A protein has these predicted regions:
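Donor nucleotide-activated moiety binding/catalytic core segment of transferases
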Residues: 82-86, 242-285
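Membrane-proximal basic amphipathic "stem/tether" segments
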Residues: 1-27, 34
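Active-site and donor-binding regions of nucleotide-sugar-utilizing enzymes
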Residues: 29-182
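Conserved catalytic-core segment of nucleotide-activated headgroup transferases in glycan assembly
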Residues: 39-53, 170, 176-249, 331-334, ...
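A nucleotide-sugar donor-handling region in carbohydrate enzymes
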Residues: 2-13, 138-211, 235-238, 352
Length: 387
């Protein structure tokens, strides 16, 4: 599929094309900050456009976003880059609803509209707790929050109480990415037996993550133990730790059993992998809840973006369930890793049932989040139109 090319002038032309639409044509707008955004939007967009027959606008900062060439006639797509055109888009936005998975609205350069009462909806891009993985106040300026589970509701309500904030609309939504993965599992699982020894390594972003701490040693141990290895660093790691990435490339890219993934893990590889090794990456919960399978957690310090997270009394979900959905391994005992991986299938049924139970208590509307979210958006539009 050939994707369009854009110059700076064409980015502004795209913005003008969006702004030329009638308000009714841009009643529902989605904004994608990066390639991962569509993982969290897809099922909701499909429900709105294909099931409810509603028109939406899809505005993206991703130059090669496949949605720019979507054949769906209910979607109008626009590329606005990530510079001054994007800043103006937010400042002068006229739309009924804007759906985003980007936190920190109105905290830095991404502002609420100064000219129109847009209703802002936030979709989480992780199941982790609000007060531990986001900056303080990251979602304060949204009108509605699509909550993954009861932990988000409890955390947001306590945050509002502690800081005297205006109550937000909280929708018992779920996690669209998990729904997509569970649906994909029916088609992909056990379709490629050549990948049965594939190990996914998914470090989080920031100082002291597993890649920085022990990544090279870990990859070396796994490859020497005849495992296939896919390393998928956080996308910001390629920018901020370029020297480390170069070292890894030079050392391992000649090995046919090693893959360095720069984007989203391809579904076929994700669903045919043997296990995941992570530290504090949100994808670890996605993996555990999709396959009802233990994750191996390397015990490195957790990055806390919110230095005042202890103002909220609730233990973060990623800490409280960590030892129940996975095995925690010290970076000083990596030699145990191959045997630990081979032993993961022991007590398989018991672990499966335990993780299923945790999933049911942690995530709302498993398999149905898009229906819940689309109904809320439809009702909101109907309310706006009746006023």
């Amino acid at each position: 599929m050939k994707l369009p090319s854009f110059s700076i002038g064409l980015v502004w032309k795209e913005l003008r094309r969006f702004e030329s639409l009638d308000l009714i044509e841009r009643s529902i707008v989605f904004y994608a900050e990066n390639k991962a955004s569509m993982n969290h939007f897809k099922s909701l967009i499909d429900e709105l456009t294909e099931k409810m027959n509603l028109d939406i606008c899809y505005v993206t900062s991703v130059i090669d976003d496949p949605m720019l060439t979507s054949k769906n006639q209910k979607i109008k797509s626009f590329y606005i880059g990530d510079s001054s055109a994007r800043t103006k888009f937010f400042l002068t936005l006229k739309a009924r609803i804007l759906v985003m998975d980007m936190p920190d609205l109105d905290k830095f350069h991404i502002k609420r509209s100064k000219i129109y009462p847009v209703h802002y909806i936030y979709i989480f891009h992780s199941m982790f707790s609000v007060h531990s993985y986001l900056r303080q106040g990251a979602i304060d300026n949204y009108d509605t929050i699509f909550c993954v589970g009861p932990h988000h509701v409890n955390e947001i309500r306590e945050t509002e109480k502690v800081y005297g904030l205006k109550p937000k609309n909280l929708v018992l939504y779920g996690y669209g990415r998990l729904d997509t993965l569970l649906e994909q599992k029916k088609n992909f699982q056990q379709t490629n037996f050549d990948l049965k020894d594939l190990i996914l390594i998914t470090p989080s972003y920031g100082e002291n993550n597993l890649l920085e701490t022990c990544g090279i040693k870990m990859i070396d141990i796994l490859l020497k133990s005849n495992f296939k290895v896919m390393l998928r660093p956080h996308f910001k790691t390629f920018r901020d730790s370029a020297k480390l990435i170069d070292i890894i490339k030079k050392r391992f890219e000649g090995n046919t059993d090693f893959i360095l993934e720069k984007g989203v893990i391809p579904p076929n590889l994700f669903h045919n992998s043997q296990c995941m090794i992570s530290d504090w990456s949100g994808i670890s919960l996605e993996y555990a809840f999709t396959f009802e399978r233990s994750v191996i957690f390397i015990d490195v310090p957790k990055k806390i973006l919110n230095p005042n997270s202890n103002d909220i009394s609730l233990e973060p979900i990623e800490i409280s369930i960590r030892d129940k959905i996975g095995h925690i391994l010290s970076p000083n005992t990596l030699e145990k890793l191959p045997d630990l991986i081979r032993d993961l299938d022991k007590n398989d049924q018991k672990i499966n049932e335990q993780i299923k139970e945790i999933r049911s208590k942690t995530v709302y509307n498993v398999g149905e989040s898009a229906v819940v979210g689309a109904k809320y958006i439809q009702q909101l539009i109907e309310k706006f139109n009746s006023n």
